[in-house]
């Protein structure tokens, strides 16, 4: 077991040397640059680790406890718990630096009831991967598994990322989110402007620079939007929305969303009526009247 009050992970980052073309070979200038964390190949051990405070790339991680494995330059964390941005996080991770400017990683994370605005402001990777959080204030939870390549600045190479999981919205206020506000303007649905969203779980997958958003529904100001589609890490949109109208959402407006997050393009179709869904309940759902079903007529060939 290893215990520490303070660890600065940035000290393990690589440094590269570059030569100033205006100097001779004997006057090489050493320039410190950020590189990936390289773990020495000679280290081989397993331990239970705990630390009161860890500094890593502008993050402050507190009260870390977990199992740590180091072997031939590879780091593994198993069932590790810590506090970050005021919330408890559980994480398992696998990390290996192929060279000073490239590392591969894979991790599973579970963070419950955290402040989405604080996460956007303080966690660089969250800010890059969830840019819409810039316009959100409130509480969400995250369960996600993702892997890929980290480059020299310890940020992901986005086309390399692959994973999936869910974001659960407990209570969030969207302010100035251009997608919702553009839909609001196009459909005269004022309730969609700066909406309050609650009790929604959004499932997504990531592959080849694309975030795929599985269909999800929510209620806001009497409307019942249903959204699905894709967005890319460079902000492009290809999404569908059905805006269920008050009071029950049975009548809805189909909407096509393209363009970018900064400049969404909204296409509106004609109102349609949804088919009523009915879940089967043992002993409660009326049985089909078989006598009312017309017989199957078979075609005959003469």
Q: Each PLM stretch: what is its role?
A:
Residues 210-211:
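Short, charged/polar, low-complexity loop and linker segments
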Residues 216-218:
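Compositionally biased, intrinsically disordered linkers/stalks adjacent to structured regions
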Residues 1-199, 203-206, 223, 228-302:
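Membrane-proximal interfacial segments on either side of biological membranes
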């Amino acid at each position: 077991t290893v215990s520490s009050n303070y660890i600065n992970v940035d000290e393990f980052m690589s440094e590269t040397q570059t030569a100033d073309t205006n100097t001779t070979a004997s006057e090489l200038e050493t320039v410190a640059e950020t590189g990936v964390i390289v773990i020495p190949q000679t280290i081989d051990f397993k331990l239970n680790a705990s630390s009161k405070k860890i500094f890593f790339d502008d993050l402050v991680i507190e009260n870390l406890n977990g199992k740590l494995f180091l072997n031939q330059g590879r780091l593994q964390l198993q069932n590790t718990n810590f506090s970050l941005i005021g919330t408890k996080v559980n994480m398992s991770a696998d990390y290996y630096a192929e060279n000073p400017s490239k590392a591969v990683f894979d991790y599973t994370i579970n963070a419950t009831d955290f402040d989405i605005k604080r996460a956007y402001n303080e966690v660089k990777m969250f800010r890059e991967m969830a840019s819409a959080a810039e316009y959100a204030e409130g509480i969400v939870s995250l369960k996600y598994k993702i892997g890929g390549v980290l480059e020299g600045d310890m940020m992901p190479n986005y086309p390399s990322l692959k994973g999936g999981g869910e974001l659960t919205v407990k209570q969030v206020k969207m302010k100035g989110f251009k997608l919702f506000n553009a839909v609001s303007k196009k459909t005269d649905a004022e309730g969609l402007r700066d909406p309050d969203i609650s009790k929604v779980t959004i499932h997504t997958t990531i592959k080849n620079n694309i975030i795929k958003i599985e269909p999800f529904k929510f209620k806001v100001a009497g409307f019942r939007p249903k959204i699905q589609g894709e967005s890319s890490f460079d902000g492009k949109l290809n999404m569908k929305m059905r805006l269920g109208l008050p009071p029950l959402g049975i009548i809805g407006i189909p909407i096509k969303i393209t363009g970018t997050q900064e400049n969404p393009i909204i296409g509106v179709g004609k109102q349609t009526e949804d088919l009523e869904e009915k879940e089967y309940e043992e002993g409660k759902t009326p049985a089909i009247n078989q006598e009312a079903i017309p017989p199957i007529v078979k075609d005959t060939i003469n």
